[in-house]
Amino acid sequence: MNITLTKRQQEFLLLNGWLQLQCGHAERACILLDALLMLNPEHLAGRRCRLVALLNNNQGERAEKEAQWLISHDPLQAGNWLCLSRAQQLNGDLDKARHAYQHYLELKDHNESL
């Protein structure tokens, strides 16, 4: 069975996920955003929101994979590198976290100078 969502339904899931996150319910946000991304894996805003929810829920391994996916699709987005750094910190990989954070700072400085 093939399930598809209209653009409006996708935005509804995204906004509800974001609202759950803002209300401090990161786990609920992940459930809604997982549903959105199961049906539309390329939804960038959904992936970014899920990444923040995963970090808030201390799910470092999933967050690291999500951040790496986002970086592979948008390597110049500084926030992706900051989230990768935080995920690696949660996973106890401090050397990688420092490297990712350094990359974040370089991109941030570069973007501010434009």
From Swiss-Prot:
Subcellular location: Cytoplasm
Record-linked InterPro entries: T3SS_YscY, TPR-like_helical_dom_sf
Gene Ontology terms: cellular component: cytoplasm
Domain of life where this protein originates: Bacteria
Chaperone recorded as keyword: yes
UniProt keywords, alphabetically: Chaperone, Cytoplasm, Plasmid
Record's keyword annotation contains Cytoplasm: yes
Function description: Required for Yop secretion. Functions probably as a chaperone which stabilizes YscX within the cell, before its secretion.
Subunit structure: Binds to YscX.
Protein name per UniProt: Chaperone protein YscY
